[in-house]
């Protein structure tokens, strides 16, 4: 029986490249001249620091633009609240990976409500979908892409 997995992953190499490009752009921008501002990647978290709250917003927009250029979906960004220490502002941006159980249940419910002839099962941080026909699986992929679930999904491990 044909099957595929629904996962939510980001390419860490592309994430690192986007952070490096964002730092490079900060060094050349006129409005960030003589300002202490930087991006730092620690595992799946980008630590953003600047001298003002307004600059943090600009830096998030810079990062979002470079993520789009590198092919990383910005919907996986989860910006935490900004904190002020002294004259500097800091903010952590966490990149979500894996499908949490409530989101997996939403996906399974979405598939069942679409009345497609497929079965969906939650397996850890991914959802496996099996069906008798490849066309049913492709309709399932189209239905999930059409739904706005607030998280980017990839479809891999397609077996026939």
Swiss-Prot record:
Keyword Transferase: no
GO molecular function: nucleotide binding
Family matches, as InterPro entries: DUF520, UPF0234-like_C, UPF0234_N, YajQ-like_sf
Gene3D superfamilies in alphabetical order: 3.30.70.860, YajQ-like, domain 2
GO cellular component annotations of the record: cytosol
Keywords in alphabetical order: Nucleotide-binding
Keyword presence, Nucleotide-binding: yes
PANTHER family linked: UPF0234 PROTEIN YAJQ (PTHR30476:SF0)
Family named by the database record: Belongs to the YajQ family.
Protein function: Nucleotide-binding protein.
Name of this chain's protein: Nucleotide-binding protein VV1_2655
